[in-house]
């Protein structure tokens, strides 16, 4: 495979990831003001700014803020998780030549959070890592690894029985592996999870995506 074709493949797959990065709910957890600000801004940019140059510009600016927060709180998994999520989002918006570098950086940041506490933010670290491992291409283009993704996402749903993102992304992974019957079970569980009244925009959009995927599976029958 030529470098040009590798970049084209990477670009297509990362484009498909856009809009899918985990943003774990944490109704029962108290975030620091700095981390809460990152979460609020991410939601405003993600769901309130149309896709395109302006959204990318704002997400990149938020990425600089997230890097600073993570540097200030290097032992706080919540800060690292949100830095990883935002860096992942930037990767999904970037050109093919910079996307993989951002994805690798997001992986490394999330690994740090995972090593501190994999259960934090409804298993935000293993969930977000799992997304990276099943959405980024594998060798020789990238570091994707379906087996590792499965292991991380299975761990995430065990750690977060009421984690909407953990269950959504596990179901989405199963759907991409054509394990549709299991995916339906997982998606149905996700929809039964109590709504996050403190994050209505994210909660509504995540459930809409789950319902759309359930409809796609039903159409295949």
In which residue ranges do the predicted regions lie?
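Terminal, low-structured helical/coil segments at or just beyond the last alpha-helical repeat
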Residues: 186, 192-221
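N-terminal leader/linker segments that initiate helical-solenoid repeat arrays
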Residues: 24-65
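TPR alpha-solenoid repeat register
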Residues: 79, 123-125, 166, 200
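Short coil turns that delineate tetratricopeptide repeat
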Residues: 74, 118-120, 161
């Amino acid at each position: 495979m030529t470098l040009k074709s590798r970049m084209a493949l990477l670009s297509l797959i990362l484009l498909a990831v856009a809009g899918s990065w985990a943003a774990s709910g944490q109704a029962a957890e108290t975030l620091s003001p700095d981390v809460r600000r990152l979460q609020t801004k991410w939601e405003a940019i993600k769901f309130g700014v149309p896709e395109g140059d302006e959204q990318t510009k704002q997400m990149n600016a938020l990425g600089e803020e997230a890097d600073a927060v993570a540097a200030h709180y290097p032992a706080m998994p919540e800060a690292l998780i949100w830095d990883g999520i935002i860096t992942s989002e930037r990767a999904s918006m970037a050109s093919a030549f910079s996307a993989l570098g951002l994805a690798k950086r997001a992986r490394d940041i999330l690994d740090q959070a995972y090593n501190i506490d994999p259960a934090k933010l409804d298993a935000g670290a293993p969930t977000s890592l799992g997304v990276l491992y099943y959405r980024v291409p594998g060798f020789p283009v990238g570091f994707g690894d379906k087996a590792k993704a499965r292991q991380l996402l299975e761990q995430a749903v065990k750690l977060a029985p009421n984690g909407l993102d953990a269950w959504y992304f596990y179901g989405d992974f199963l759907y991409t592996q054509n394990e549709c019957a299991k995916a339906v079970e997982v998606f149905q569980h996700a929809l039964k999870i109590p709504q996050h009244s403190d994050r209505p925009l994210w909660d509504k959009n995540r459930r809409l995506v789950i319902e759309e995927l359930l409809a796609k599976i039903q159409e295949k029958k």
